[in-house]
Amino acid sequence: MAYPLQLGFQDASSPIMEELLHFHDHTLMIVFLISSLVLYIISLMLTTKLTHTSTMDAQEVETIWTILPAIILILIALPSLRILYMMDEINNPSLTVKTMGHQWYWSYEYTDYEELTFDSYMIPTLDLKPGDVRLLEVDNRVVLPMEIPVRMLISSEDVLHSWAVPSLGLKTDAIPGRLNQATLISTRPGLFYGQCSEICGSNHSFMPIVLELVPLKHFENWTTTML
């Protein structure tokens, strides 16, 4: 979960988010090296009086600044493509949950269970209890089993929405008339907060998402009480 004045990412709680954090560090290091090289060259230009006014052709230099950027782009593209394929890969999910976006709340349907559906609204500020998080608490949490692949089917009944949970590396658009999917695997139990990440109207800021990841036994007990 995020905290005040946070500058970095939230702690990763899924394999996908772990990969995204590694890719971020990898790319940031490349950007740092390029920036350092550019600043070094600029400092040399400003502090020395060496000039090459008579130079008309420099094949070696042109070759270097053509090949080197191509290599850098390959070093960025390959791990990026790998993560994209990992995010799209779904192998025999144990549970499927259908998520529908509305103005301005979410509804959930556990397709593996009969009549296990509910709406999830934000709890107003005046109704919060001590310890609750303002603008992020909901009346019905999405309870899911941890360490088990879960397929999320995401769509919308009105306008564009986006179902996003940062600590799990999830952000999938909810588009009317189209069903998108995402894979969710949590490596630890806990509460994970998210929000609608697509401007969808006047109450866009009041569409929080709360996932409660629990051991499988607790999930089975929860489904029994809900049915």
Swiss-Prot record:
What is one Pfam family matched by this protein? COX2
Which InterPro entries does its entry note?
CcO_II, CcO_II-like_C, CcO_II_C, Copper_CuA, Cupredoxin, Cyt_c_oxidase_su2, Cyt_c_oxidase_su2_TM_dom, Cyt_c_oxidase_su2_TM_sf
GO CC, alphabetical: mitochondrial inner membrane; respiratory chain complex IV
Cofactor mode of binding and number, as noted? Binds a dinuclear copper A center per subunit.
| Superkingdom of origin organism | Eukaryota
What is this enzyme's EC? 7.1.1.9
Entry membrane topology: Multi-pass membrane protein
Mitochondrial intermembrane-facing ranges: 1-14, 88-227
PANTHER family assigned to the protein according to its UniProt record, in alphabetical order: CYTOCHROME C OXIDASE SUBUNIT 2 (PTHR22888:SF9), CYTOCHROME C OXIDASE, SUBUNIT II (PTHR22888)
- Organism equals Tupaia glis
What UniProt keywords apply to this chain's record, in alphabetical order?
Copper, Electron transport, Magnesium, Membrane, Metal-binding, Mitochondrion, Mitochondrion inner membrane, Respiratory chain, Translocase, Transmembrane, Transmembrane helix, Transport
Give the protein's function. Answer: Component of the cytochrome c oxidase, the last enzyme in the mitochondrial electron transport chain which drives oxidative phosphorylation. The respiratory chain contains 3 multisubunit complexes succinate dehydrogenase (complex II, CII), ubiquinol-cytochrome c oxidoreductase (cytochrome b-c1 complex, complex III, CIII) and cytochrome c oxidase (complex IV, CIV), that cooperate to transfer electrons derived from NADH and succinate to molecular oxygen, creating an electrochemical gradient over the inner membrane that drives transmembrane transport and the ATP synthase.
What parts of the sequence cross the membrane?
A: 15-45, 60-87
What is the protein's name according to its record? Cytochrome c oxidase subunit 2
Which residues make up the binding site for Cu cation A1? H161, C196, C200, M207
SUPFAM superfamilies for this protein: Cupredoxins, Cytochrome c oxidase subunit II-like, transmembrane region
> Annotated Gene Ontology MF terms?
copper ion binding; cytochrome-c oxidase activity
Gene3D superfamilies associated with the record: 1.10.287.90, Cupredoxins - blue copper proteins
